[in-house]
Amino acid sequence: MAQFDNVSVKKKANVYFDGKCVSHTVLFPNGTRATVGVIFPGALTFNTGSPELMEINSGACKVRLSGESDWKAYGAGEKFTVPGNSSFDIEVTETLDYVCHFE
């Protein structure tokens, strides 16, 4: 999907890790939400409240889910899921353009 139609977007940006991750919240008519943003190169750890589906639009990264020892590489057009009440480490090698869907 190249665009979201009939949605609301929160104007205030979500800025994390001293600006290394910047996103905006998108609210869908059915009550679900997502964030659309970028993560700049570096290594970060994110905590999750609800399950997440991360869609990579462009860029490159490696991800390691909580409790796992192996890293998995992701690039444009790929997705990964993260359980709720968990965390994941991410190493971004090329600025990541992403959509994070909250389930």
UniProtKB/Swiss-Prot annotation:
Keywords: Glycosyltransferase, Transferase. It comes from the Bacteria. The keyword Transferase applies. Its EC number is 2.4.2.1, 2.4.2.2. It is an enzyme of class 2 (transferase). SUPFAM superfamilies: RmlC-like cupins. One of its GO terms (cellular component) is cytosol. It catalyses: a purine D-ribonucleoside + phosphate = a purine nucleobase + alpha-D-ribose 1-phosphate; adenosine + phosphate = alpha-D-ribose 1-phosphate + adenine; cytidine + phosphate = cytosine + alpha-D-ribose 1-phosphate; guanosine + phosphate = alpha-D-ribose 1-phosphate + guanine. It holds the Pfam family Ppnp. GO terms for molecular function: guanosine phosphorylase activity; purine-nucleoside phosphorylase activity; thymidine phosphorylase activity; uridine phosphorylase activity. InterPro entries: Ppnp, RmlC-like_jellyroll, RmlC_Cupin_sf. HAMAP family: Nucleos_phosphorylase_PpnP (MF_01537). Catalyzes the phosphorolysis of diverse nucleosides, yielding D-ribose 1-phosphate and the respective free bases. Can use uridine, adenosine, guanosine, cytidine, thymidine, inosine and xanthosine as substrates. Also catalyzes the reverse reactions. Belongs to the nucleoside phosphorylase PpnP family. This is Pyrimidine/purine nucleoside phosphorylase. It comes from Methylobacillus flagellatus (strain ATCC 51484 / DSM 6875 / VKM B-1610 / KT). The lineage of its organism: Bacteria, Pseudomonadati, Pseudomonadota, Betaproteobacteria, Nitrosomonadales. The gene is ppnP.
